[in-house]
Amino acid sequence: MTHHSLPRLLSAVALAVAALGGCAHVQPPAQPVAVNIVAINDLHGYLQANPYSVRDSAAADGVRMLKAGGIATLGGMLTQLRKDDPQLLFIGAGDLVGGSPPLSAMWADEPTLEALRYMDMKLSAIGNHELDNGKAEFLRQLNGGCESNRPTKACQFRARYPGSGFPYLAANLIDTDTGKTLLPPYRIEEVKGQKIAFVGAVLRDVASVVSAKGMQGLRTEDEAESINRLIPELNRQGVNAIVAVVHQGGSTPEPYDKQDCSQLSGDIVDVAKRLDPAVDVLISGHSHKGYLCKVGPLLVTQGSSYGHLMTRLTLDVTPGQHRVTGIHATNLLADPAQYPADPQMLALQREVEARSNNVLLKPVGAIAASPITRRANAAGETPLGDLIADAQLAAGAAHGAQIAFMNRGGIRGDLALEPGLKRLNYGQVATVQPFNNTLIAFDLKGRQLEQLLNQQWKAEGNFDALQVSRGFSYRWDSTRPLGSRVIPGSVRLNGKPVQPERNYRLVVNGFLADGGDRFSLFKQGINRSDLEVTDLDSLIDYLHRMDQQGKPVGSAKSAGRIVKVK
């Protein structure tokens, strides 16, 4: 070895030692950061606490009834949760407004949006009911202003309506005028130094549950495909977690608070299975169920409806990476007895009540039984469905109507007398029928009626039982093939078999008349006429008139117009 090579050798040794020393001081892995998210879905403008049933082993029948929800309670819950984490993110999964009780609906749902703004909602996926009054009216509710197709309701609660105060998201709702999404597809919220991406979507089949007018200028694309397309873009922005917020749902027989429930079924399951693995959690809505289920490795949640539950999620997020090491979820019951009311929300609720009661408390009529519920028997018939169909048949009598049909999804509550009162009031009746759909009369042939009834059973397994009016009846068999479950020859009107080639005059609401809920046979009706009366007005008139005649209507039990043989 030459004297020139020795210094080089010593230098190399020194560098190696330094490198080894450096290994001893490698930075430890970054600790996960807890990001808290609180979600509600399907609030539907319920400003007040309202009836909810929960499983309770201590109750005589295993079910406890209470009043849950209401903006005062929801606000109180958020106040308490924010004491633990002031940076929690409050979000929605659609149908926050629309299909609302009159306390909110008579003011174009502006009090509900005002409440959510005060509660600092960060974002929401759009639901189908946000589109009840069409694209332009939804955009007004989003952005503010008073130019509305509901001039007697918009800007009546406040002279100036500033907008929702939070963005709606939809990756799959396309404005046909531009070919682009009507709304931002996603939003990134930065909390505790972490980037959390929320991607919104509405159910692909939204056109089947929104009126044709409501969907004008809009179309939808597949939920999962629309979300998956955005994953590379989100990753380029360095997000630490991706949350899908989809207004589509499912159901399970398991309790709303069961961890990692495993029996979830319905449309949301297919969406969940097809989502990119980069999606960390799926917050759902639409089906009005509470669950915390797993679909494969993906957690899928929903918080019932009407403000009854709040879904709380804690994501353990790894700084500097898109990596979630843990997710904990709970569905919290919005029990007014457990959470002190938020003073600001309580004041808003009382203001709305005080300004609405002169209309809402107006007596309508007596009923022959209380409650009259929308709970279906095994055949799919409900006591309240019977009553509403009878009211619509009475409204169509002058137009020759022989049969009325009512969709169960349009019946939004039960009818029950308040303690000490003998008559229902306007607010109670309007809560049950909030959509103000015009009634339409038209003709279908007898053979078309049977085809129509067979459309109640959907390919995915749902049974959307139409409610039928007095004098109309049929029988069905669950063991018969899809598309032919109505027993041939069992469809009768006033005790006589319906004749295949004879025309029969029907009356239905405008939503059904346009083929809503995928009842396409209604669109084949001929000799159409607009009754120029709404479903709500027909029910109010029927209740009032029968009460005045001393013949109050309604029953606690279904009338047996629909019979399931097996």
Predicted regions and their residues:
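Bacterial N-terminal signal peptides that target proteins for export
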Residues: 2-11
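Extreme N-terminus of proteins, especially the signal/transit-peptide cleavage junction
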Residues: 3, 26-33, 356, 360
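C-terminal motif of bacterial Sec signal peptides marking the signal peptidase cleavage site
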Residues: 19-22
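Acidic, metal/ion-coordinating pockets
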Residues: 24-338, 379, 383-394, 404, ...
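Feature captures C-terminal
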Residues: 33-36, 46, 156-186, 294-298, ...
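Acidic/histidine-rich, surface-exposed loop or edge segments in extracytoplasmic proteins
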Residues: 44-62, 364-375, 433-435, 517-525
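Hard-cation-handling environments
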Residues: 324-424, 447
